[in-house]
């Protein structure tokens, strides 16, 4: 090997020079490709004209709401499929200037359930962005603007969520539209859970109507009594139902009760899909200790006719008064 050291050294030096040359040529070629792609892939989309002179797409949902007699939201386009926590929801708004705006507006967009105060995501930006802000618009301009919202991975699901938006002036005051309203609601979108909820403490199996099963319940007693019912959808219910939860004593008299839509109204039964598991909490105003022999009576009814859904046990026997009896320890 020693006699070959000279040759090995020469060949290594020559190979190194060749490799360096190839590497430099490769880097130069990649930089040239990058320089050609950047204007089309990055710069052109970022600085594309927001003007939208063509007819609105057929997939857009009409809105036609005018703010401050100056700016009209003509329509919006958004995915119509179900979402999951962590997904991205892109919404494209189509605005029109009814007249040249006298000021620069800000647009706020939020994502929230049926209660708009419980927003889970929110953004504020100039209307039209920095490329073509609203105070530069001319009468008749139709502007396309896309807002992308990322759904939090820890958001409550399943449930219904709305996109709510509005305009504010330069002082932060909301701009009204219509009959003095200042917040526009779009949607809703159904957000389905990625995983099953925690298993209930007590497993049961009762059929409530033809589409719904009661799979279990959990009772928590602190300053009040919270009953979390676990519903399962066997098929899609035909309408919205109301849940009743009654706490009764050994004599059958009602001690406390709560009636309301499942999931605090954030996921009405008419939106349930086969396979959905819905944890449904109801709070009853009562403090410890519970009276001896207390029971829970649970069921569903039609809020219009007040007719209860029939309740059946695992043997197919219909229960008296269409009530599910649940044991609660004192």
Set out the residue ranges of the language-model regions:
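Signature aromatic-anchored transmembrane alpha helix within multi-pass, membrane-resident enzymes
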Residues: 16-44
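C-terminal luminal/periplasmic domains and tails of membrane-associated envelope-modifying transferases
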Residues: 38-330
């Amino acid at each position: 090997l020693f006699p070959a050291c000279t040759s090995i050294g020469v060949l290594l030096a020559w190979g190194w020079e060749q490799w360096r040359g190839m590497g430099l040529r490769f880097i130069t070629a990649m930089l040239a490709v990058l320089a050609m792609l950047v204007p089309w892939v990055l710069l052109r989309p970022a600085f594309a004209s927001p003007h939208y002179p063509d007819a609105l797409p057929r997939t857009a949902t009409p809105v036609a709401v005018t703010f401050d007699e100056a700016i009209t939201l003509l329509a919006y386009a958004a995915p119509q499929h179900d979402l999951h926590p962590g997904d991205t929801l892109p919404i494209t708004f189509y605005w029109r200037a009814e007249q040249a705006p006298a000021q620069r507006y800000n647009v706020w967009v939020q994502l929230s359930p049926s209660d708009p105060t419980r927003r889970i995501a929110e953004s504020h930006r100039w209307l039209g962005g920095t490329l073509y802000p609203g105070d530069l618009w001319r009468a008749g301009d139709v502007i396309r603007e896309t807002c992308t919202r990322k759904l939090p991975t820890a958001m409550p699901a399943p449930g219904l969520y709305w996109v709510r938006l509005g305009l504010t002036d330069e002082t932060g005051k909301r701009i009204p539209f219509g009959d003095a309203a200042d917040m526009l609601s779009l949607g809703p979108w159904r957000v389905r859970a990625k995983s099953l909820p925690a298993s209930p403490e007590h497993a049961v199996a009762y059929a409530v109507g033809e589409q719904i099963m009661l799979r279990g319940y959990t009772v928590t007693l602190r300053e009040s009594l919270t009953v979390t019912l676990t519903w399962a959808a066997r098929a899609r219910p035909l309408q919205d139902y109301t849940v009743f939860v009654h706490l009764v004593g050994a004599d059958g008299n009602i001690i406390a009760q709560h009636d309301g839509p499942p999931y605090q109204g954030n996921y009405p039964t008419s939106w349930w899909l086969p396979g959905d598991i819905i944890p449904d909490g109801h709070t009853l105003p009562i403090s410890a200790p519970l009276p001896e022999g207390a029971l829970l009576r649970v069921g569903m009814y039609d809020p219009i006719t007040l007719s209860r859904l029939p309740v059946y046990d695992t043997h197919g026997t219909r229960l008296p008064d269409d009530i599910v009896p649940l044991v609660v320890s004192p």
